[in-house]
């Protein structure tokens, strides 16, 4: 961003609010855009996102608006912090010369990567932001780290400068598919971990699930050109640990609710892993890949298996060596 210009943060949910606060903490003024004018007006007045991030006050450096053209006016790039299903509509309303930083951990409606979808619309400067980042902790200024990946090193460096502070380390990467898809797939594994919690399967089961889930992530990501180092980095293993174990995690909580026979919906908040499971399962079937944990979650969320049946299918797979080539 140019000196003194505000960083557009498009999306005033919990994560968008936390990123706007993080930018201000780094000395970067921010413009937080909310889709609903009434919500934006209330947020601007009370200076606290009581619906999505209660207890975190907006600093003076964060302005709030519902005017999208005004929010991005004069900006070099913007953070897009809306659920994946809302990204296409938001992209359609943005100037193509704007750099876009995609912060959702999901897929486009057609199952493609959001970065590919943005490039297909004519955006030449695209980045993705991902890591073990719970909004509740980032907003409070607790220590954390994240990764911004882009084929445009200047864009990645600019995002790093805008967000890096004593409480948030920002690393750069050129591995866009690895950083982007690690955040997508770990959500599904976290749903499975939550189901295990809801079924009271114990620590051994969770450790097994996360270890085999990481192997599943590695096979899937590397088949799409990701680097193995990324899989075991912040946006892969790091995000998996945070999402599969934390009480803040929507995906883990949704899986636990399903296992208990309750609704996985959480006050209107989007649970990316529930939608992504079906898209990833369809991709695996179409391309001849075996993603057993993804398949189990997809079958359960479609109502074709119960959580207990999902466990039986996973535990009943054929015997094999732990590290057999090509096997998850």
From Swiss-Prot:
**Which Pfam family, an example, fits this chain?**
NAD_Gly3P_dh_N
Superkingdom of the source?
Bacteria
Enzyme class (EC, first level): oxidoreductase
Q: Which InterPro entries match?
A: 6-PGluconate_DH-like_C_sf, 6PGD_dom2, G3P_DH_NAD-dep, G3P_DH_NAD-dep_C, G3P_DH_NAD-dep_N, NAD(P)-bd_dom_sf
Q: According to its UniProt record, in which pathway does this protein act?
A: Membrane lipid metabolism; glycerophospholipid metabolism
Q: Where in the cell is it found?
A: Cytoplasm
Q: Is the keyword tRNA processing in the record?
A: no
Indicate where this protein is primarily found.
Answer: cytoplasm
SUPFAM superfamilies from the xrefs? 6-phosphogluconate dehydrogenase C-terminal domain-like, NAD(P)-binding Rossmann-fold domains
Q: Which Gene3D superfamilies does this chain map to?
A: N-(1-d-carboxylethyl)-l-norvaline Dehydrogenase, domain 2, NAD(P)-binding Rossmann-like Domain
Stated family: Belongs to the NAD-dependent glycerol-3-phosphate dehydrogenase family.
Protein name per the record: Glycerol-3-phosphate dehydrogenase [NAD(P)+]
Q: Which organism is it from?
A: Deinococcus radiodurans (strain ATCC 13939 / DSM 20539 / JCM 16871 / CCUG 27074 / LMG 4051 / NBRC 15346 / NCIMB 9279 / VKM B-1422 / R1)
At the highest ranks, the source species' classification is: Bacteria, Thermotogati, Deinococcota, Deinococci, Deinococcales
């Amino acid at each position: 961003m140019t000196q003194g210009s505000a960083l557009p943060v498009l999306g005033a949910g919990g994560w968008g609010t936390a990123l706007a606060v993080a930018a201000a903490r780094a000395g970067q003024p921010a413009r937080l855009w909310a889709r609903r004018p009434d919500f934006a007006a209330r947020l601007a007045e009370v200076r606290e996102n009581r619906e999505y991030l209660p207890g975190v006050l907006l600093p003076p450096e964060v302005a709030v608006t519902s005017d999208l053209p005004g929010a991005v006016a004069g900006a070099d790039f913007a953070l897009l912090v809306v659920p994946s299903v809302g990204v296409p509509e938001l992209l359609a309303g943005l100037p193509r010369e704007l750099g876009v930083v995609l912060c959702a951990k999901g897929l486009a409606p057609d199952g493609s990567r959001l970065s590919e979808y943005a490039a297909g619309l004519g955006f030449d400067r695209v980045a993705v932001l991902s890591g073990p980042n719970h909004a509740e902790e980032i907003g409070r200024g607790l220590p954390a780290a994240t990764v911004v990946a882009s084929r445009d090193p200047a864009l990645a460096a600019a995002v790093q400068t805008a967000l890096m502070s004593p409480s948030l380390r920002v690393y750069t990467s050129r591995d866009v598919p690895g950083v982007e898809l690690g955040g997508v797939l770990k959500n599904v594994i976290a749903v499975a971990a939550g189901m295990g919690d809801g079924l009271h399967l114990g620590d051994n089961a969770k450790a097994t699930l996360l270890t085999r889930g990481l192997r599943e992530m590695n096979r899937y990501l590397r088949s799409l050109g990701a680097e193995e180092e990324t899989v075991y980095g912040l946006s892969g293993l790091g995000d998996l640990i945070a999402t599969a174990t934390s009480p803040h995690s929507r995906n883990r909580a949704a899986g636990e609710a399903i296992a208990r026979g309750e609704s996985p919906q959480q006050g209107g908040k989007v649970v990316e892993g529930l939608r992504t499971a079906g898209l990833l399962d369809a991709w695996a079937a179409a391309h001849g890949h075996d993603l057993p944990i993804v398949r189990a979650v997809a079958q359960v969320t479609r109502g074709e298996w119960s959580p207990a049946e999902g466990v039986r299918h996973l535990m009943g797979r054929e015997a094999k060596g732990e590290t057999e080539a090509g096997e998850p």
